[in-house]
Amino acid sequence: MTVGKRKLSNGTVNEAKRLDDHVPVVAPSTNPDFENANGEDNEDIDDYSSEGEMSPQLENYFPQTTSWQKTITKVVKSVVSIQFSHVSNFDTESSAVSEATGFVVDSERGYILTNRHVVGPGPFCGYVVFDNHEEAVVRPIYRDPIHDFGFLQFDPKDIRYMKIEQLDLRPDLAQVGTEIRVVGNDAGEKLSILAGFISRLDRNAPDYGTLSYNDFNTEYIQAAASASGGSSGSPVVNKEGYAVALQAGGSTEASTDFFLPVYRPLRALQCIQQGQTITRGDIQVEWQLKPFDECRRLGLTPEAEAAARSQFPDKIGLLVAELVLPEGPADGKLKEGDTLISINGTPIASFISVDEILDEQVGQSLKFVIQRNGHEVSFDIVVGDLHSITPSRYVDIAGASFNDLSYQVARCFCIPVRGVFINDGSGSFELSPFEKNGWLLEYVDDKPTPNLDAFVEVMKSIPDRKKVSISYRHVSDFHTENITVIYVERHWQSTFRMAVRNDSTGIWDFTDIQDKPLPAEEPVPQNAKYIDIPFDDPEKSGCSQLTRSFVQVRTIAPVPVDSYPYRREIGYGVVVDAANGYVLVSRRFVPHDMCDIFVIFAESVELPGKVVFLHPNQNYAIVKYDPKLMLADVKTPKFSDKPLKRGERAFFVGYNYNLRVVTDDVKVSSVSSINVPVASLSPRYRGTNLECILLDSKLSQECDSGVLADYDGTLRAFWITYLGETNCDQTNDRVYRMGLDVTDVMSVIKSLHENKVPAGLRILDAEFASMTIFQGRLRGVPQEWISKFEEVCEDEMKFLAVDRVSAPALGQVATPLKTGDIVMSVNGSIVKTMRDLGIMYNQDSLDFVVIRQKKELHLNVPTIDTSTLNTSHVVFWCGSILQAPHHGVRQLIEKIPSEIYVTKKNSGGPANQYGIATNSFITHVNDTETKTLESFVSVVKGIPDNTYIKLRLVSFDSIPVAISVKTNYHYFPTFELKKVNGEWEETEHKV
């Protein structure tokens, strides 16, 4: 991804975006070197004489390349490619890895000038690469609160093989018609040289959209140079080699580029060089440069216009107040539409003059003279400190991040610069799946949070696992107050810390605010009232109390393991044992046991739950709650001992998309052997080797949860949801809604009735799929076996064949089954359906008769212990989440390269910056083999911080690769989550 060229959608409206990807290099179609005066290609012009000399016709038209060559030779030795990461969300910016351009402005001290949107407002880590491919670590030393420039610093001693050149800043040399070159990392190509001519000096700052960084209160320079992503921070140089401007953005629909004048960067550089504080003043007013004709329409008098034109003959307009922020220094004094005439007696016609005056008068009262509706009015306004309304700290807690509201955001929506801003609405503060930032907190647990300090004190008083109400607004809809209840989770994500920017070191210093949260409050017994299902038909009255067997199950999965794509899910489960407190629920809603579970009764009472069992094949989980805490009349339903058959009728009770109870008379249309399709790009758990019930009811497909029952209330099947593949554009996950026969679950239910959780369940580590008799004949099944099948099959006559064989886990023996084997019998019994394989759950091995390549084989097939299938160890390292390959991975791969599987990575971490791919396997660290997570941790915890290490990886497609990764333990410490005696424990490894 390449940050850099932030381009407008067109040259006339204030819409813009950053180009975040490499842009293919295309030969420009408007190169003046190859066009005639009419703009047509010069293919038919005799450009050169027969002696090889340039024709007189074009002698003066071509630029003097010799002088430019000398200039460029010097410039390229000052230009650097910046490889960087914004490691954390902060203010308007999200964590990201990117590249851009900068150039040396002080070779002795190692100062580099680049854009503010490159340095970023938050934590920054990066390095620069010089023209000779030497690199140096850089640290940010200044980022301007408003204008799009910042400074990085490197150690000049790190560059040993090249003389570093520096560019002098000469903003005064930027003139209309000046020929310029933009030298930088255009389109991520490290070095590109783009030509153009300055066409404007007085453009208003481009607008890149709301909730994004925007420059304002400054002129921009315009030129046509066709720069693209990665060119941000490039020097704009004239023929003499002076930097006359700084590349910042451009149009997305034209070749137009926008450059920042370097007046304020020059002043900031001089302050840094002299060890002085860079003062920045502001009155919280956004000005726009408007032409004189528009100023007249807004109330500028002819006399004032004449005076301005006389004083500034080269100017085309004046500054007009576009926005006055509430509660700012100018609030109640200046108004939108006021035309600025002077400040403290100094006539004003440019942003540069305003900056020069305000920056030197912070804290002072200045006299502003404006024209309003044909009248001249003056006000005394105290200049505020711009740094004081620019956040320089943030708080991490409960998986989310917060900072004080910034001037940047407040200006976009014309709101006061105060409040707690959610820059990363994740974890407990995930208020919308679509909007991660832009929220302002007003109350937490009914206590006001006017600023970050007040918010910290409120959060310190809230126990772990408590549910509290919050009041909040979105800055884009400030009229609407939102109130909701959140779950404060601080056991999976225990961090509660303050990060403060340290300009002397360039890093952000962390301070732990609270080592441990207050202990969770103990739940108390509660009662709830159920409302039964009303029926006019007395024959169905036995189903009226089935709602007493349903509970709502809410899941929070804070750690993205096993490639499960969701963090929060809501579904319904069935109480299969009310006396002992057991609930059966789809693994679509409870994917693994690394989550918090809440069981809600009668839409009224909520109790904590715990995952105690995960079926490896049949897509259901068992959740336990404490029945002593539920005083309501929860019912254990009756269970049938007869499997449903095709054509049978049943009564459907389910919960639809609105979580409302619906009912329907249904008929079983099919009972089929099914495997849920795979999500190949992100392998995850899915139901396999299933015998599923399909219905002819449209209503059932609107329900994620439910049951099939007889009219007397006896349960025949559970209606559950199966998570399947991802659609073609990777935006949505396909789900399947099917029935699971009660008889297929009864062995587990009987154990639960004895208050025993099934343990030691065993399975065949292979997938089977149905095959028609016709296909079996073609593949060599003899008539003898076909006749046996025809004698015993009652419904569909189909064989089962091995569809896929899982890769064995470390230390496991591979199954003798092979893809394509057609199963005839198991332990002497003919296999007609998936249900006939159910004997595997309590057998160490099974005797198979299969047809393979038209030959009959007798195989003894071992089963595997499923107690090791569930994830029990997770490692967080350099922004990546590592775990042993879960069962969904092993089902789709032939061989496991190692037990270190990359399941997720942070967008701003070293793992993303240096190319650790998700769904890959780490096999070696510094050429030391690391087969397991334990061996990996043992090696990396001895590697110092800020050190390059070599990793060898193998992709999911078995392609080996070697990369180098630089550790960053300050922002991305190494820690583990490990399941010990049924409980998860966290261990941090400090270097």
Swiss-Prot record:
E.C. designation(s): 3.4.21.-
InterPro entries: PDZ (IPR001478), PDZ-like_dom (IPR025926), PDZ_6 (IPR041489), PDZ_sf (IPR036034), Peptidase_S1_PA (IPR009003), Peptidase_S1C (IPR001940)
Predominant place of localization: nucleus
SMART domains: PDZ
Positions of the catalytic residues: 117 (charge relay system), 148 (charge relay system), 231 (charge relay system)
SUPFAM superfamilies with a match to the protein in the record: PDZ domain-like (SSF50156), Trypsin-like serine proteases (SSF50494)
Start and end residues of each stretch annotated as Disordered: 1-57
One of the GO biological process terms: apoptotic process
Listed Gene3D superfamilies: 2.30.42.10, 2.40.10.120
Biased composition (Acidic residues): 38-50
An annotated Gene Ontology molecular function: serine-type endopeptidase activity
Designated name of the protein: Pro-apoptotic serine protease NMA111
Species of origin: Meyerozyma guilliermondii (strain ATCC 6260 / CBS 566 / DSM 6381 / JCM 1539 / NBRC 10279 / NRRL Y-324) (Yeast)
Gene: NMA111
